[in-house]
């Protein structure tokens, strides 16, 4: 499944509002446009017109990722997603995974810590490890939905990005790490143990090279 930046924003807003304000869901074009252009909880901040949002909805409808719903006695058309967790969706996500994908669609690459802090209205993570577990599950799917970005210079933590929008990947200068890359939260003891094993292996290799050189002389 591939989305444009505008499609990702629309889907993200529909997911968010379904979870946080279910009484107002599905959304009208006006409400959806306001949600897309919010000044908070959105990165980047956009300024889409209703016409642009409507064009995006038309594109998503062709991909069968949204549907229209008209209320009884109302002429206002409202929109709901078919992105995941519906009878029409191939994609099924648990609550933790859904909250994670929603935030990545709305706010771009983020660290596990940022995702936990920003997810309180979508899903309650008890700690960062639960966020990392959700990210790991999403990254290890047959068709990965997220990937770990290389750590930025001067930053303590690496960020994760969603893989629905190729535009986002093209804009970043960070190489994408393999989905099976070791998480950056490995304990100090694990890292020290790994370094010790590597040092032993390097020492053995040096000894073998020295033996080979001695035989060649």
Swiss-Prot record:
It comes from the Bacteria. InterPro entries: DUF480, WH-like_DNA-bd_sf, WH_DNA-bd_sf. It holds the Pfam family DUF480. Belongs to the UPF0502 family. This is UPF0502 protein swp_3027.
């Amino acid at each position: 499944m591939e989305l444009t930046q505008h499609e990702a924003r629309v889907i993200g807003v529909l997911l968010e509002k379904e979870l946080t304000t279910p009484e107002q869901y599905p959304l009208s074009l006006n409400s959806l446009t306001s949600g897309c252009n919010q000044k908070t909880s959105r990165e980047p901040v956009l300024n889409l017109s209703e016409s642009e949002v409507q064009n995006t909805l038309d594109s998503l409808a062709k991909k069968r990722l949204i549907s229209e719903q008209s209320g009884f006695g109302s002429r206002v058309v409202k929109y709901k997603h078919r992105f995941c967790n519906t009878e029409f969706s191939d994609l099924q996500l648990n609550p933790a995974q859904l909250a994670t994908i929603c935030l990545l669609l709305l706010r771009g690459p983020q660290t596990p810590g940022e995702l936990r802090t920003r997810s309180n209205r979508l899903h309650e993570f008890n700690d960062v490890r639960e966020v990392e577990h959700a990210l790991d599950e999403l990254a290890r799917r047959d068709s990965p939905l997220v990937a770990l970005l290389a750590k930025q210079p001067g930053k303590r933590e690496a960020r994760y990005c969603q893989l629905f929008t190729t535009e986002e990947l093209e804009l970043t200068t960070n190489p994408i790490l393999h989905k099976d890359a070791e998480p950056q939260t490995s304990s100090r003891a694990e890292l020290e143990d790994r370094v010790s094993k590597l040092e032993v292996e390097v020492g053995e290799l040096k000894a073998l090279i020295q033996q080979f050189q001695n035989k060649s002389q």
